[in-house]
Amino acid sequence: MAKKPSYIGLLNAIANGERGGYELFKAWSDTTDDPLLKPVLDMIAVREMEHSWAFEKRLTELGFSLRPAASKDLKKQVRFLKSDASDEEKFASFGVGGKTLAKSDVPQEDGLLQILADRTIDPQTGALMGRFISEERDTGRQLIKAHRALVRRTQAVK
């Protein structure tokens, strides 16, 4: 058997993190009363789960299996997103709103390119990571856009 690639732990962490992301966005989607926000949350939830499956698949292609990780923080956040808290409060729990709303057009360092810092990553894994980075950034843009729309709708009602 070939030597274990240095990035196996990273693939495992991403797969677990994205599975948790699915749980978060699905919980929020299931509880929002906003018919315009729900499809955005559903798209993000599906994207998160697809990322989890893609990274788990890559692990198996490399001869390894996913090591599931439990998180008390995840369970706590899922409970919050299933609660009757407002969508505005739920956006805030993801760091969207307030100051983020005003500065959302300014490119900010997100650290995602650090994922590709390992020069031993094979081309297939690198391509998967590149797509992941692009889609994660798009998810951030979609959340900011959805938040702005929510704020506009809320202000129009007042």
Located regions from the model:
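Non-heme di-metal
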Residues: 2-158
